[in-house]
A protein has these predicted regions:
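Expand to "…catalyze enediolate/carbanion chemistry for C-C bond making/breaking, isomerization
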Residues: 1-263
Length: 263
């Protein structure tokens, strides 16, 4: 089976830089995959992407050096299994708040006896190789999103779930639930404390600590804080930012420092 290079990168104590796709286009997925990202994630939760589009995007990413990942819309086992069959080498699952939810998520990603994933890898065989089913349980990456107060309370139990590789903070939802305002770069004391705790517990339990960021600068700061899996904005945010900068430069204006959210 084709190895999951993200696990090698993390084992060498190098951070994973992850691209993020919300635009339903295999062409833009291919472009992003060629930019040097370690991984590129197809977003089925907040991205404007259906399964048919996701399939072609995963095919496009597979032609690059980036590892193809998917954020599923929810923790429904059928959806998780389907994106894995389509060739995703990892799943980011939103709104995980308990150890029980984590176990169900991980189980859907693993073939028996470690889990309940149904056999039918389809494109997984094409991308992963003929021995896919023998090694998929080891290679497929599992990240549970921490974005609720309940998830923070149950963080230790979530991280102790057998087969879970780590967690990925959804900062907008986490900020919304903790402070009443959605802000990926919130400096509210409760938000800062929550982020510090996630990093600390992941380090102690040797798990991946991931987070969505609004820019490369913000991603670098998160790495300095101890995160080892960062997403420096999504394609919508990057396209908008590049366009605003180009327009400002053409008009001789100051480059804007803020803009619309990627969602």
């Amino acid at each position: 089976m084709r190895v999951n290079n993200l696990k090698r990168t993390l084992a060498e104590n190098r951070p994973v830089i992850n691209g993020w796709l919300a635009i339903p286009s295999s062409y833009s997925a291919e472009i992003m995959g060629h930019q040097g990202y370690d991984a590129v994630t197809v977003d089925l939760q907040h991205g404007m992407i259906d399964f048919a589009s996701a399939l072609t995007m995963l095919q496009a990413i597979s032609a690059t050096s980036a590892v193809p990942l998917v954020r599923v819309a929810d923790s429904t086992p059928a959806q998780i299994m389907r994106v894995l069959d389509a060739g995703a080498y990892g799943v980011i699952c939103p709104m995980i708040s308990t150890a029980e939810q984590t176990q169900r998520f991980v189980s859907a990603c693993r073939y028996p006896p470690e889990g309940v994933r149904s056999f039918g890898p389809a494109r997984g065989l094409l991308y992963g190789g003929a021995d896919y089913s023998l090694h998929a349980n080891r290679e497929i990456l599992t990240l549970a999103m921490i974005e609720t107060r309940e998830g923070l309370i149950n963080l230790d139990a979530i991280l102790e779930t057998e087969g879970l590789d780590g967690v990925f903070i959804g900062p907008n939802d986490l900020s919304l639930t903790l402070t009443g305002t959605a802000s990926a770069e919130s400096t509210h004391p409760e938000m800062l404390s929550a982020i510090e705790r996630v990093v600390s517990r992941c380090r102690d339990k040797r798990k991946i600590a991931g987070i969505f960021c609004t820019s490369g600068t913000a991603a670098a700061q998160r790495i300095a804080e101890g995160f080892n899996f960062v997403t420096p904005a999504n394609d919508v945010m990057q396209l908008g930012r590049a366009s605003r900068e180009a327009i400002a430069l053409a008009r001789g204006n100051a480059i804007p420092t803020t803009g619309a959210s990627g969602y």
